[in-house]
Amino acid sequence: MNYQPTPEDRFTFGLWTVGWQGRDPFGDATRRALDPVETVQRLAGLGAHGVTFHDDDLIPFGSSDTERESHIKRFRQALDATGMAVPMATTNLFTHPVFKDGAFTANDRDVRRYALRKTIRNIDLAAELGAKTYVAWGGREGAESGAAKDVRVALDRMKEAFDLLGEYVTAQGYDLRFAIEPKPNEPRGDILLPTVGHALAFIERLERPELYGVNPEVGHEQMAGLNFPHGIAQALWAGKLFHIDLNGQSGIKYDQDLRFGAGDLRAAFWLVDLLESAGYEGPKHFDFKPPRTEDLDGVWASAAGCMRNYLILKERTAAFRADPEVQEALRAARLDELAQPTAGDGLTALLADRTAFEDFDVEAAAARGMAFEQLDQLAMDHLLGARG
């Protein structure tokens, strides 16, 4: 298989990903800042489909209206010249000190109102540039002290904010949906809507739930010790996987943002298997940080590696599914039986069926092996390249 990506693969990157300068809580930047135009050009050359941005990635915070228009004009010219798309945009509601206690759930009312206006302004730009998804990550929406935040009231304010944003895009006629990005902690000690499940439950309370889905990130769910492919499966089951952030993570620790495929490779295998078999057609967005050990050549090598690893795993998972021995093992594991309704003949028939309870041979059923180990080893063989 050719592992050279093309725009048809729908791989996208945020300006903040390859543009990360390597600054962290313990050290200064190790790389120069990247011009967004340079980023667009380099990513296009690597075969990416598009680029995404926070408002402050593209337009430095505090820019005048004239400066803002100049930045947008240069960016648009780069997009037009390369054919790169902008499938998604988002708002930076976490960097400036004004957001130290959050944005939509800040205790200060004036900060909440400012956050809404800042978001609405960038929604206008996102729609202008053709984005179909608007991501919301509430990195500062949370607390370190149980006394500092009434979580029930904070969720009221969160709901109010999203309802207002939904009202705005509807009134403007924008073809735009929102994707809530969960994260359990960092930078706050505890963040509201920490997992996919929390976000899905929250969405059902909104006035226009059809406008809202989720943008799960590999590392964020794994920081909480959760199974990322399972979270994606539930989002797909709910019809709410509006966007996805791909990266790597090695267990429960800080948010590593490794390139995709680094970290938990088995989870990456099952994730690609799920996305491809489910027919996910949205952008495959890499939200990662090239390690601060790298120079700019290493940055672009890391970005290329994200796409290459996805394509390799796509090939390996397709071979796994097509393998006759795997198909036989799937039948032995009774996956086909799981697809059958448990009581398709209805409750009355279930209650009347003595083989379902009175005459059910519990010991014989308990003695049946599930053949999962053979099936899993076949998956490992394909992942490790030991089978064709």
From Swiss-Prot:
One Gene Ontology term, aspect cellular component: cytoplasm
Catalytic reaction list: alpha-D-xylose = alpha-D-xylulofuranose
Co-factor(s): Mg(2+)
Annotated localization: Cytoplasm
Cofactor binding comment, as recorded: Binds 2 magnesium ions per subunit.
One GO BP annotation of this record: D-xylose metabolic process
EC number: 5.3.1.5
Principal subcellular localisation of the protein: cytoplasm
Catalytic class of the enzyme: isomerase
GO molecular function: magnesium ion binding; xylose isomerase activity
Sites where the protein binds Mg(2+) 1: E181, E217, D245, D287
Family: Belongs to the xylose isomerase family.
PANTHER family, A to Z: PTHR48408, XYLOSE ISOMERASE
NCBIfam families: xylA_Arthro
Summary of subunit composition and partner proteins: Homotetramer.
Designated name of the protein: Xylose isomerase
Gene: xylA
